[in-house]
């Protein structure tokens, strides 16, 4: 974990790259991670009532194990969802990034792990690029060789049984399936997530910067589900605490040539569907950054 500023926390899902700056952005080597207002996040996950917090790189929904039917020691053992791969809008020469995933862990200020699998919609020097990947923090992310295109329907899941993690992603449109089983010594099972993210890039020394968020338009998640303490439910199940995340980029986190082309864009989730299993995340242009002059919210 890397503290940033007064109340921001980074849970790093590391992908090492040779340099930071324009070369990192143009290489297409990015990392995912969790940077959230710590005070807001901790308070939200400590109550059973829904809450909304602001993050510099997450948009979507997170559930924690402090709802009506769980205790602080409850563990989440699976998470899943479907989504439609969004098309990215790229300006000439633009390098920007967006990742979409389901995962377990990574939302706590003490977390050292995050188990996730998903897709990306990136702009690389003005050209759209789409990919699949998985990651078990603190290990580096791994690109999946199967192809994904805008409009494809993707189904993804993460399951953990003891020290074995099973990560699966299907392209239902192209009828391809990837499954990977890995050993993980200390998984984080304290939360489950359905996220659209502005990724970051790291160099070999571990120094990281957040990359500009790509204009992905809107992504629609459906059939979202998770399991905790043997109970299976949707995002809005009363057995766990629900938190919505709004994303507002923080230009101060960016550095060098990347910062010059960045603006404080963002993304926000819609309300959940009536069955608590579907929502959309919409990209938003030039959102005003939150006030950094006072105490953190919460």
Predicted regions and their residues:
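Exposed, interaction-prone regions of secreted/extracellular proteins
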Residues: 25-291
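Bacterial N-terminal signal peptides that target proteins for export
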Residues: 1-9
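Bacterial N-terminal signal peptides
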Residues: 9-19
């Amino acid at each position: 974990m890397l503290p940033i500023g007064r109340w921001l926390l980074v849970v790093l899902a590391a992908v090492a790259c040779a340099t930071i700056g324009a070369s990192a952005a143009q290489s297409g080597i990015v990392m995912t991670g969790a940077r959230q207002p710590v005070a807001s996040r901790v308070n939200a996950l400590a109550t059973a009532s829904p809450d909304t917090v602001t993050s510099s790189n997450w948009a979507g929904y997170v559930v924690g194990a402090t709802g009506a039917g769980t205790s602080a020691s409850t563990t989440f053992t699976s998470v899943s969802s479907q989504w439609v791969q969004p098309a990215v809008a790229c300006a000439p020469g633009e390098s920007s990034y967006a990742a979409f995933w389901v995962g377990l862990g990574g939302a706590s200020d003490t977390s050292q792990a995050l188990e996730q699998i998903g897709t990306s919609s990136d702009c690389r020097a003005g050209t759209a690029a789409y990919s699949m990947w998985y990651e078990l923090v603190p290990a580096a992310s791994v690109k999946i060789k199967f192809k994904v295109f805008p409009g494809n329907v993707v189904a993804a899941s993460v399951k953990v049984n003891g020290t074995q993690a099973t990560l699966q992603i299907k392209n239902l449109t192209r009828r391809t399936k990837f499954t990977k089983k890995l050993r993980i010594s200390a998984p984080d099972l304290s939360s489950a997530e359905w996220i659209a993210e502005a990724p970051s890039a790291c160099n070999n020394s571990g120094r990281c910067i957040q990359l500009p968020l790509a204009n992905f338009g809107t992504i629609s998640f459906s059939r979202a589900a998770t399991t905790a303490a043997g109970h299976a439910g949707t995002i809005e199940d009363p057995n766990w605490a629900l938190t919505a995340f709004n994303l507002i980029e923080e230009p101060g986190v960016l550095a060098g040539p990347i910062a010059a082309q960045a603006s404080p864009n963002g993304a926000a989730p819609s309300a959940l569907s009536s069955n608590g299993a579907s929502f959309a995340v919409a990209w938003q242009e030039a959102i005003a950054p939150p006030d950094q002059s006072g105490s953190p919210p919460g």
